Amino acid sequence: MWKIVPLCNKQLRDINKIDILHNGHFRKCNTYKSGGGYDKFPQIAEKRLGKNVFNQFIVQLYGCVLDCPYCYVTKDGYFGDYVLYSSKDLVDICVKEGLEIFHLMGGSPALYLEDWYEIIELLPNNIIFHSDLLLLEKDYKLEWLNSIKTSNSLYAINIKGVTLDDFYKNTNREFNVGLFLRNFDKVMESGINFYLTFTNPDKRYLNEFKDILIGEYGKSILDDSFVIDLIEYEALKD
C-alpha cells in the first residue's frame, strides 16, 4: 500500500480547481505549464521515448529527506496525514482520467524505490511512468533499479546544489557525498532512462560541477539536462 498525502491548503493556492482529482487526493496538470515553462519533460519524452505527451497524473507520497525552503509542496504536503492506496487503485484512477504520464512525486518518492515496479508493471504501455531521484534517500540496490528499467519509463535525477554550501542553502541538509556517488554509480550501471536537473544552482560553480560529472561519467551524462530556477509560489506566502 502507498502512503498518499492529499493536497494541503497551501498547495491549493497554486492549483486550478478543475485539476483536483478524487476529493483532493490527487491532481492533474499539463507538464509544461505546471513548471511555469521550465519543465523540458515533454521534449525529452518525445526524443527518448517517441511519445508526445503533456498531461500528467500526480501522486504525492509521504516523506522527504530534505527541507528545501522553496518547495511548493510544503511540509504539510509531504508530512501531512496520509491515506493508503494500492498500486492497482492508483493505476486505475490514472487510466480512468485518460492521463498520459503517471508522476510519482514527493517529497522524496525514491524512499519507496523498491516498490516502484509494482505500479510500472500495471501501467499500460501508452502511459509513461515518471519519478524523481535525489540519490540521497538511502542506499539504492541494483535490483531495485533494474526492476524499473522499462520502455515506458523516464526519470529525473534532481541535483540540489553544486557545492557543499550551495546544497545546504537549497536543502537545509548536509550533502552526503559518499551516498550520492554510490547511488549515481548504481544508476549508471542499471542503464535506466534518466536526465539531470539542477535546482537553483550557484551558477558561478555550475560548469565546474558539470566538468566533474563529465570526467566521471562521460559527456552524455549532461544530455537533456537543464536548470530549474526558483518560482515564487503562492503556497510559500504566509
Regions from the PLM with identified roles:
Residues 75-85, 97-112, 125-141, 148-180, ...:
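Core AdoMet radical
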